[in-house]
């Protein structure tokens, strides 16, 4: 959100709870949708209005299958995470054909920016100017041990708080 705002790029953010939506809106984020009943109709209208054609998906699972029919023509989905756990991504083949969708894996470690020292330096300088943005602060909610990763992944906390994994203390 911080990067999109700093570059004046239209962006739509999907969240799981109304509390998370309120937290983002209070931070100045304009287009935030809760992934509840009927959100795909609003997503379709808003994505067409804003001409958004890139999806950065850190969740995977069934959410991607829900939003795919609402995406504009020629959209590209960049998958970079798996907060949806082991739930498979299911998108009907006909959607790829009808909407000319593309799905790609995204990794910061393999991007053109990271492989080019000048681009990397410029990107880091940009991020440096945003690092103190409150939107980038992790609001720590419940703590889990490493062996509780499945519970942490399934944990939904209010107000945008996050489940975090903590290393065992070696006292």
Give a label for each model feature.
Residues 24, 62-133, 167-171:
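Glycine-rich phosphate-binding loop and adjacent beta-alpha segment
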Residues 38-50:
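Short amphipathic alpha-helix with an adjacent loop that forms part of the alpha/beta core around
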Residues 31-38, 141-147:
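Short acidic-hydrophobic, aromatic-tinged amphipathic segments that line or gate anion-handling sites
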Residues 1-36:
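Mid-domain Rossmann-like dinucleotide-binding core that forms the NAD(H)/NADP(H) cofactor-binding site
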Residues 29, 51-52, 136, 149:
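Local beta-strand N-terminus motif with an aromatic residue
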Residues 53-56, 78:
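N-terminal Rossmann-like NAD(P) cofactor-binding module of classical short-chain dehydrogenase/reductase
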Residues 128, 134-142, 150-171:
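C-terminal capping/lid region of NAD(P)-dependent oxidoreductase domains
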Residues 48, 71-72, 157-158:
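Short conserved AdoMet
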